[in-house]
């Protein structure tokens, strides 16, 4: 199979990268009625598979799970989760032939085998759904001409898809129809109904393309969402301990610091996050973030270029063929890092202390979010897509670090995201260790500086204006208007 994106001419590539429209609430007035009375069969019962299924069933749809025969006879975790939640479970041969909509919600590396298995079993005119377009775009999966191919991609982990639905809300979602597979022109109606059934229409839906979703998703998760959190955690912990900070305190400051800092980001963007700092600290964080952006821009651009060209996918799929040798090796290295093995800290850290003692962490978040956004937009991805794949998802990923450090983050994210995270962090850590961390001053990380520092009013004004007028702040203000009911997610400590 050939990389689908690379088979397109430049005009087609730009058109698909730039496909992005924020859909109006009234476009979902029909809810999920298009799928009422239809048979929806989900393949895969992981975080997205189970939680989307629960939401869709609660929305009145007929949901069942198709699993491999071995998973059923051996009562594996997927079978256990589906049956524990009262779903009908059967083999591919039992359920796929009568399905009107088959949702392939398995991990990326399984998509090709799953599609090859289920496609001959699917009835004429059925639909096939994805929540990530890697198989279609990067692997170039060819789908039977009579099958409609759609995507509904919630912009958060599966657990949050369920929790927000239970609150009567939802999570922002991208939907798309594969232009090569919409024989009856029904794709958009199916995608809208699926998104509505998961609750996505309550939080905002972008009409996108498979191409735009894949390229922006890969970029976000490799850089700011996972790669920067991994690199920043390892570097900041080592710096604190090297300068005499109690390892237990350092571990807690980093583990819960990302979550606390990005909670402000979630509620009011970069501006609110920066406003949580004192004026001298805000100026310093702005200065550090500009330094980071200059230093790291080539690395961000390299990752975007490799994603666009298909180099990243080629490298990762080569590792699949080697039984994930690189992935497992990098995972083991992370598990042995000093931060991952830091002792527990019994004391309390006040919320403001995370900001006051984590000025460089704020700078890393600001620089990473802005760089990821700028790099995606410069590559033809629209601002709305770039926002969701950078700033919006960051608090959700930071929350996983707060639970069980980097181990939890790398367990929750996909193997594709984990592989990309290591690629980025493995380059970012030595770069920042040599050229950035030695430039830090007293008060940038750890104990904050004493009060009484002077502030240049004009410098503060310029920093505030630059932050608030960044394009991600402007589009973020609009998109957050559709998410006014966002709950706090910080687990704190």
UniProtKB/Swiss-Prot annotation:
By its UniProt entry, which SUPFAM superfamilies does this protein fall under?
6-phosphogluconate dehydrogenase C-terminal domain-like (SSF48179), NAD(P)-binding Rossmann-fold domains (SSF51735)
KARI C-terminal knotted domain location is: 209-344, 345-486
Q: Say which species the protein is native to.
A: Aeromonas hydrophila subsp. hydrophila (strain ATCC 7966 / DSM 30187 / BCRC 13018 / CCUG 14551 / JCM 1027 / KCTC 2358 / NCIMB 9240 / NCTC 8049)
Q: Which residues bind substrate?
A: 414
Q: What is this protein called?
A: Ketol-acid reductoisomerase (NADP(+))
Q: Tell me the cofactors it needs.
A: Mg(2+)
Q: Which GO terms describe its cellular component?
A: cytosol
Q: Where in the numbering of this chain does the KARI N-terminal Rossmann domain appear?
A: 15-208
Give the binding site residues for Mg(2+) 1: 217, 221
